[in-house]
Amino acid sequence: MTETVVVTGGLGRSGRWICDRLAESYHVVCVDVDHPGWEIPERDSVDFRAVDVTDGGEIRDVVAEYDPDGVVHWAALPSPERHAGSRVFETNVTATYNVLDAAGRAGADIVLASSESAYGMAFAEETPVPAYLPMDEAHPMAPEDPYGTSKVAGEEIAKMVARRDGVQVASIRPSWIQYPGEYNCRDVATGDLAGGAGNCWSYVDVRDVAGIVEAALDADGAGHEAFHAAAADNYVGRPTAELVEEYWGDVPAECELEGDQSALSTAKADGLLDWSPDHSWREAADAEVAEPNLLAE
């Protein structure tokens, strides 16, 4: 019997890639604030539900209807710069609690969209130098903005649900997500280094994001774990330690970067999820790849 997974934010820019990937082996319930249209035919393996995930009753109803094996919570306000800070924080934290609470009580394994922004570098007024490089998932998290703080709070909710309900919860901390043929990071690469210092010039291809979500769902783990999702290299094409020293004037005392190695280590995902990134800007920036289609062919 095919397992069922509910994906919130499933019609979002990266969410649709996740749904498309999962639909190859799961029955996917694509949840978003709007339905794509009642007269649009669906793929056999995809259902759509219009749900406001800040309303706990709505997401509980969907979880009760489908009794999913897994829930991927990918819906969020993705930046502190487009909405009032209070709205970003309240929306993200409330939605995360509602979705994870419903999923945990239903006994579903969970994959949560966290963020590299939880470390506090991306939106800081003065970008702090990392404590060590490469950064692993144990690196201190000290955000100064509502978005990054909402992600830290979200991971605490994830830990609570894992403890309370005994389900597996994976918090994915993606780097700056890029899309085949549309690598905006390369525009930053040709400009001032300050434009990429907030994540040490790291990035990740959306196809690799979809891959780590699937790997987390398929994993046989327990409790809560956080994982980086990042490409193996930086997007500038120069040694990462050289970029760090040029921008901050020095490198951390503990710096074990080699060449253009990413500042975000993915060794944990490799070890526990058997996942590693497949894509680099060198081939993906100009790649012609069709956008995912969640509708019937």
Please report, for each region that a protein language model flagged, where it lies by residue.
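A conserved pocket-lining segment of Rossmann-fold NAD(P)-dependent short-chain dehydrogenase/reductase
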Residues: E137-A142, S171-R207
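N-terminal Rossmann NAD(P)H-binding glycine-rich loop of SDR-like oxidoreductase domains
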Residues: E3-E24
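Glycine/proline-rich active-site loop of Rossmann-fold NAD(P)-dependent oxidoreductases
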Residues: R164-Q168, Y179-A189, A215-F227
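NAD(P)H-binding glycine-rich loop region in Rossmannoid oxidoreductase-like domains
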Residues: V51-T91
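Conserved Rossmann-fold NAD(P)-dependent oxidoreductase catalytic core, especially the SDR/UDP-sugar
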Residues: N98-E144
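Active-site helix of classical SDR
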Residues: P146, S150
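Mid/C-terminal beta-alpha module of Rossmann-like enzyme folds, strongest
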Residues: A210-T266, G271-L272, L294-A296
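Conserved beta-loop-beta element that borders a ligand/cofactor-binding pocket
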Residues: S114, E155-P180
